[in-house]
UniProtKB/Swiss-Prot annotation:
Predominant location: mitochondrion
Gene: MT-CYB
Cofactor: heme b
Annotated positions binding heme b b562: H83, H182
Subcellular location: Mitochondrion inner membrane
InterPro entries: Cyt_b/b6_C, Cyt_b/b6_C_sf, Cyt_b/b6_N, Cytb/b6-like_sf, Cytochrome_b, Cytochrome_b_C_euk/bac, Cytochrome_b_N_euk/bac, Di-haem_cyt_TM
Protein name: Cytochrome b
One Gene Ontology cellular component: mitochondrial inner membrane
Gene Ontology terms describing biological process: mitochondrial electron transport, ubiquinol to cytochrome c
Taxonomic lineage of the native organism: Eukaryota, Metazoa, Chordata, Craniata, Vertebrata
Positions that bind a ubiquinone: H201
Length: 379
């Protein structure tokens, strides 16, 4: 009799994806973040579901319903902070996951990479809309500022913004639709993640050396299941330390003040994981130019497979490209810091220089490093 996991139509899919999947024997801990993202997504869907049971998407009661969750619902405070800090953990894992793809040349799997970028956009949209829901000061003004950016689109901009708002300002209609989208998008993300995996399993995983590993594969279970469980335990440990000891460290104090359209907070800024893009947006004095730079700062990832000039796939044996990669990481950290600072000297010029460096590195310096390394190989 054949094994049920190899014969049953449904179990067979799981078997080929997580049990008997041939996996390169040398993939490092940087390959753990895909499974960690899956865990983050499940955690966010579950905590979000329980929060939605008590939340009311109405401008008059949204803020107090969140307070009610924290004060009156059993373990409501924990569910709320798991959800808020879970989003931060999600983005930390995401940035590392994308960085790993950049470093080891995983972007040469075109379909997997492109779906990953669509996932990134969907995730950013979901997180932004979730930030609006507690209806604090930063929720309201963040929603106003970010949606207003679309008014920079020529001819249709103003109409588009009013259409998204459902009126002439961010109000009840906006909050209701943001809640509806925030609820449905994680399930779309789940479907996209499955597609992402489907395309990945067509080619098999990349590995740190960047060379084909068909002659040296091992089954996913038990080797990588146990490795993923260790990663998951560490993720949960860090998340619980955040939730139980420093629940508000990544949030904004302004969001504990109910939304007031009549008073603007001194510094309007998004959550920390959007600050790098916000800094790029602010570094350009022109509104349309800023919006284009903001969009391109993420869309530029689509160009990366076409900007690969090196004869080697991975950066493992390319010291010059490694320098460029870590310079890019340092630049993104600088942009994140600048995004949280007020618009004044010297932060303006630092932000502008960091933005120029960001685009220069990806479009010019990294491809150039690849060409130089190719020539060095001929010596």
């Amino acid at each position: 009799m054949t094994n049920i996991r190899k014969s049953h139509p449904l179990v067979k899919i799981i078997n080929h994806s997580f049990i008997d999947l041939p996996t390169p024997s040398n993939i490092s801990s940087w390959w753990n973040f895909g499974s960690l993202l899956g865990i983050c997504l499940i955690l966010q869907i579950l905590t979000g579901l329980f929060l939605a049971m008590h939340y009311t998407p109405d401008t008059t009661t949204a803020f107090s319903s969140v307070t009610h969750i924290c004060r009156d619902v059993n373990y409501g405070w924990m569910i709320r902070y798991l959800h808020a800090n879970g989003a931060s953990m999600f983005f930390i894992c995401l940035f590392i996951h994308v960085g790993r793809g950049l470093y080891y040349g995983s972007y040469t799997f075109l379909e997997t990479w492109n779906i990953g970028i669509i996932l990134l956009f969907t995730l950013m949209a979901t997180a932004f809309m979730g930030y609006v829901l507690p209806w604090g000061q930063m929720s309201f003004w963040g929603a106003t500022v970010i949606t207003n950016l679309l008014s920079a689109i020529p001819y249709i901009g103003t109409n588009l913004v009013e259409w998204i708002w459902g009126g002439f300002s961010v109000d009840k209609a906006t909050l209701t639709r943001f809640f509806a989208f925030h609820f449905i998008l994680p399930f779309i993300i789940l479907a996209l993640a499955i597609t992402h995996l489907l395309f990945l399993h067509e080619t098999g995983s990349n590995n740190p050396s960047g060379i084909p590993s068909n002659m040296d594969k091992i089954p996913f279970h038990p080797y990588y299941t146990i490795k993923d469980i260790l990663g998951a335990l560490l993720l949960i440990l860090v998340l619980l330390i955040l939730v139980l000891f420093f629940p508000d460290i990544l949030g904004d104090p302004d969001n504990y003040t109910p939304a007031n359209p009549l008073s603007t907070p001194p510094h309007i800024k998004p959550e920390w994981y959007f600050l790098f893009a916000y800094a790029i947006l602010r570094s350009i004095p022109n509104k349309l130019g800023g919006v284009l730079a903001l969009a391109f700062s993420i869309l530029i990832l689509l160009l990366i497979p076409y900007l690969h000039t090196s004869k080697q796939r991975s950066m493992m044996f390319r010291p010059l490209s490694q320098c460029m990669f870590w310079l890019l990481v340092a630049d993104l950290l600088t942009l994140t810091w600048i995004g949280g600072q007020p618009v004044e000297h010297p932060f303006i010029i630092i932000g502008q220089l960091a933005s120029i460096l960001y685009f220069s590195l990806i479009l010019v310096l990294m491809p150039l490093a690849g060409i130089i390394e190719n020539n060095l190989l001929k010596w």
